UniProtKB/Swiss-Prot annotation:
CXXCXGXG motif repeats lie at residues 147-154, 164-171, 190-197, 204-211. Belongs to the DnaJ family. The gene is dnaJ. It comes from Streptococcus pyogenes serotype M6 (strain ATCC BAA-946 / MGAS10394). A zinc finger (CR-type) spans 134-216. Homodimer. Zn(2+) 2 binds at residues 164, 167, 190, 193. GO terms for cellular component: cytoplasm. It is found in: Cytoplasm. One of its GO terms (biological process) is chaperone cofactor-dependent protein refolding. It holds the Pfam family DnaJ_C. PROSITE patterns: DNAJ_1, DNAJ_2, ZF_CR. Binds 2 Zn(2+) ions per monomer. This is Chaperone protein DnaJ. Its main location: cytoplasm.
């Protein structure tokens, strides 16, 4: 067996996270569950998935598997030349106990203990203004819920699961294997109860013995003012159903703020770019500035330069931590005209002369130049 076969069984890459492995296991386990999939070979595939997950879900077993393959994960290393001689493997009192301790016995976990359900993620888009002022959104999604027919037991109403006759409720079987190092002991998932410790003689017809069913779910999310892209809101108990009576997992709402056509934002500060003419910059003016709180008047002092930034106090977004309101920064951009009529050109030339600017005056426009300008203006 190569060192990627277990990953292939679950359909994940070798660098998959534990969360990815867990999700893939649940998907494949449900796909090949003998109570659901009656196709030939489905039961064997189900066992293969269980075997792969048993190793990859344990960080120490996974590390051994990545380095040595299945033999490493199961404790079956072969002895090298002049290797671990002197171990006769008598009984089970020595070497195999070291490996059992190193790899962590799977039987120590109680398969019947309540376990919390999986967490879910949901992405919500917000307009620029919704992120600034806050909003309440209703989100709809599908989740694994406790089966309404069997109430999560997996058994047909009127019946109940019984203790597994093979593993006696432990969910695992102990297998002893003779190796060059001596007798090695390993634990595998029980092939009768598939690790649950229980047998369901008469499965529920709604959930086919899983105890869960897919359900459309809605929940209202209160999004506070001042949030930003990437922030999360945790809704406790709105994830997927638990196991053996365990609680539901949580829902994490991930926020994405859509861009504004006129504003930019960083934290509680909002940024706005203002175009003004060079006469407004030179002589000064009072202009109306849009903000998320409404238009306000702002004075442009005479002699304002391109790149000058003005601050409108309290016109930004709320501060999530510490309270208070941010500011809006207005950056000025002086627009140079690209076309001048004769009167404008002469006025500017007179201004240049009065300022003492030394310029090479452009030649006076002739008849054809004026015709060309007139055509461009049509």
């Amino acid at each position: 067996m190569n060192n990627t076969e277990y990953y292939d069984r679950l359909g994940v890459s070798k660098d998959a996270s534990q969360d990815d492995i867990k999700k893939a296991y649940r998907k494949m386990s449900k796909k090949y569950h003998p109570d659901i999939n009656k196709e030939a070979g489905a039961e064997q595939k189900y066992k293969d998935v269980q075997e792969a997950y048993e190793t990859l879900s344990d960080s120490q077993k996974r590390a051994a598997y990545d380095q040595y393959g299945a033999a490493g994960a199961q404790g079956g290393f072969g002895g090298g030349a002049g290797g671990f001689g002197g171990f006769d493997g008598g009984g089970f009192g020595g070497f195999e106990d070291i490996f059992s301790s190193f790899f962590g016995g799977g039987g120590s976990r109680n398969p019947n203990a309540p376990r919390q359900g999986d967490d879910l993620q949901y992405r919500v888009n917000l307009s620029f203004e919704e992120a600034v002022f806050g909003v309440e959104k209703e989100v709809s999604y599908n989740r694994e819920a406790t089966c309404g027919t069997c109430l999560g037991s997996g058994a047909k109403p009127g019946t109940a699961p019984v203790t597994c006759r093979k593993c006696h409720g432990s969910g695992v079987m102990t297998i002893d294997t003779q190796t060059p190092l001596g007798m090695m002991r390993r634990q595998v998932t029980c092939d009768i109860c598939h690790g649950s410790g229980k047998e369901i003689k008469e499965p529920c017809q709604t959930c086919h013995g899983t105890g869960h069913e897919k359900q459309a779910h809605k929940v209202s999310v209160k999004i506070p003012a001042g949030v930003e892209t990437g922030q999360q809101i945790r809704l406790q108990g709105q994830g997927e159903a638990g196991f053996n009576g365990g609680p539901y997992g949580d829902l994490f709402v991930i926020l994405n703020v859509l861009p504004s056509k006129q504003f930019e934002r960083n934290g509680s500060t909002i940024y706005y770019s203002l175009d003004i003419s060079f006469t407004q910059a030179a002589l000064g003016d009072t202009v109306e500035i849009p903000t998320v709180h409404g238009d306000v008047e702002m004075a442009i002092p005479a002699g304002t330069q391109t790149g000058k930034t003005f601050r409108l106090k309290g016109k930004g977004a709320p501060k999530l931590r510490g309270g208070g309101q941010g500011d809006q920064h207005v950056t000025v951009n002086i627009v140079t005209p690209t076309k001048l009529n004769d009167a404008q050109r002469e006025a500017l030339q007179a201004f240049a002369e009065a300022s003492g600017d030394k310029m090479l005056h452009p030649k006076k426009k002739g008849f054809f130049d004026k015709v060309k300008d007139a055509l461009e203006d049509i």
